[in-house]
UniProtKB/Swiss-Prot annotation:
The keyword Cell membrane is annotated on this UniProt entry: yes
Organism (species): Salmonella paratyphi A (strain ATCC 9150 / SARB42)
Cellular compartments annotated: Cell inner membrane
Primary location class: membrane
Family note: Belongs to the binding-protein-dependent transport system permease family. AraH/RbsC subfamily.
GO molecular function, one term: transmembrane transporter activity
Name listed for the protein in its UniProt record: Autoinducer 2 import system permease protein LsrD
This protein's UniProt keywords: Cell inner membrane, Cell membrane, Membrane, Transmembrane, Transmembrane helix, Transport
Subunit field text: The complex is composed of two ATP-binding proteins (LsrA), two transmembrane proteins (LsrC and LsrD) and a solute-binding protein (LsrB).
Taxonomic placement: Bacteria, Pseudomonadati, Pseudomonadota, Gammaproteobacteria, Enterobacterales
Length: 332
């Protein structure tokens, strides 16, 4: 297939991203400053980190809406472990394991109950979120400040740059490369696509469906934990509400990136570009003085438009056939 046709959606997203930055740059010229542009990504790049493995979950025919609560639970757990005197490196490792366990819980419940993933992860969203609030209350960190007192080396980590690139953005780029190779260049990635197209056929074809689902959900949980660590470092405090606003932007990024909400197709490159597109949209609106409520409403509207547009695109032949029959009936 012609590369231009194969990556036409990603090319369109890249062009739209450039146009968006230039448009907001006209409103606020500061956004055209390369340093401002790069460092402004630190405010939203964790959404992209979570959106990458979430793409694999959705392509497999699944769904996970609990990652925001997982981020909050991992963040407050990191703070509590540090508060109890645990060495920070060990606390971070345990936090990453906790994120993976949250993902494994999701996968296990989905596989062994057969209940719709949306329903299961809705339940675990409240389970993990409630656990985070309980842990926060027990630690006396119910206020906006959360748990602080982290070493300067840790709090500086998410605010420093390497070769002029902010560290969170470097993490995102590394994650992009990892998940792109995993999804588009390995047998596991091929299995994810096949499961999304038909889990039953994949099962009959001796594809390890359960193992693949456990892996993609665990990676989403682990990515949520990575996002939690970066957010705690960036803000300098561990709070249970970190990640609470990630749900809509992350899902919008995955769907806008080209993933079929019913599974079977999707693109890591598309999700990465869409995450930047959604992030800069929110950032640009904020710099233009638009209230957060309107920004959230626009993100929701964007998600609806994309879902409807993708649905129309997938069923365009049936729509054209129906329109042709209607026109012929009127002419007769």
């Amino acid at each position: 297939m012609n590369p231009w046709r194969r990556y036409s959606w990603e090319i369109a997203l890249a062009a739209l991203l450039i146009f968006e930055i230039l448009a907001f740059g006209v409103i606020n010229p500061r956004l055209l400053d390369i340093n401002v542009l790069l460092f402004s990504t630190s405010d939203f790049i964790c959404i992209g980190i979570v959106a990458l493995p979430l793409t694999m979950v959705i392509v497999s025919g699944g769904m996970d809406i609990s990652f925001g609560s997982t981020i909050g639970l991992c963040a407050i757990t990191l703070g509590v472990l540090f508060q109890l005197g645990m060495p920070l490196p060990l606390a971070i490792i345990i936090t990453l394991l906790l994120g993976a366990i949250c993902g494994l819980i999701n996968a296990g419940l989905i596989i062994y109950t057969g209940v719709n993933p949306l329903v299961i992860t809705l339940g675990t969203m409240y389970l993990f979120g409630g656990s985070a609030l309980l842990l926060s209350g027990m630690a006396g960190a119910t206020g906006y400040e959360g748990i602080g007192g982290f070493p300067t080396a840790f709090t500086d980590f998410a605010n420093i740059s390497f070769l002029g690139i902010p560290m969170p953005l470097i993490f995102f780029l590394v994650c992009c490369l990892f998940f792109w190779l995993l999804m588009h260049r390995t047998h596991m990635g091929r299995n994810v696509f096949l499961i999304g197209q038909s889990a039953r056929v994949a099962q009959y074809s001796a594809i390890p469906v359960n193992r693949t689902l456990y892996t993609v959900y665990a990676m989403t949980g682990c990515a949520s934990a990575i996002a939690a660590v970066l957010l705690v470092s960036y803000f300098g405090s561990a709070r249970s509400d970190l990640g609470a606003s990630f749900l809509m932007p992350a899902i919008t990024a995955v769907v806008l990136g080209g993933a079929n909400i019913y599974g079977g197709s999707g693109s890591i490159m598309g999700s990465a570009l869409a995450a930047l597109l959604v992030g800069f949209l929110q950032q640009g609106l904020q710099m233009a003085g638009v209230p957060n409520q309107i920004s959230s409403a626009l993100s929701g509207a964007l998600l609806i438009v994309v879902v409807v547009g993708r649905s129309v695109s997938l069923h365009r032949h049936q729509i054209l056939e129906w329109y042709s029959r209607r026109r012929n009936a009127h002419q007769a």
